[in-house]
Amino acid sequence: TDTRQQLSEPRQLSVPFIAQQDYYCGPAASASIARYRQLQADQQTIAAMSFLPGRRGSLTPEMQAASRRLGLMPYPLARSFSDLLREVDAGNPVLVLQNQGLSWFPQWHYAVVLGYDLASETLYLHSGEHPNYALSFATFNATWARADFWARVLVDSGNVPASARPLPYLRSANAFEETGQRALAKAFYRKASQHWPRQPEGWLARANLAYADGDMAAASAHYRRALQQAPDTASLWNNYAYALDARSCA
């Protein structure tokens, strides 16, 4: 209730609607958010990256990988309806997975949460072929719970989700580095260090990436910033010394 008192009332984002084709509810939902983020993406392109014909759908790992290929971080939302509302209030549509069937006979469905009305306890979603579909809080929460509260906020490197915390954000950013998208990883690490300048982890991530790229000047500068926040961390001092040594030998 405290969170709800801080929210705008009511709220509805102008998210482009893309009606799903065939079994493309996931690609259509992702394409809607990509368009909202000013990216030119269509459901066919996203389906080519994520759709599994044998499953007649897109599984969550493929959906996240497709988002990263578009340059969007799929930040994992906490299992919190309040955080979901908070993201929408901050201007972030949320990609959600619902189970519209039963636990023993699931009917998986992706949708985009884009608005709410607290007074009537109504949520608004782009869902399948239905734009701005109205659903009660209770009904949504039931279908969301049966999908284990799966939700992702898709953001570019210029935005940080309203409910983001440093370590989950950096883990999500690291997925870009692990898949070879180093320029994007660098951009998200930079955003983390700007958004949480007193947290050493963002500076450490930037330092390690710069070190791996052979940029010892940047690596030593970022290690130094990390040490300012965590001066008692021996491993940081070691890494800083290695970077300084490599820089002097270059």
Predicted regions and their residues:
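Noncatalytic regulatory segments and standalone regulatory/sensor domains
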Residues: 1, 118-204
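Structural marker of alpha-solenoid helical repeat scaffolds
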Residues: 195, 229-230
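Active-site-adjacent substructure of cysteine-protease-like catalytic cores
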Residues: 73, 77-126
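Cysteine-nucleophile protease catalytic domains, especially the papain-like/related folds used
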Residues: 2-80, 84, 90, 159, ...
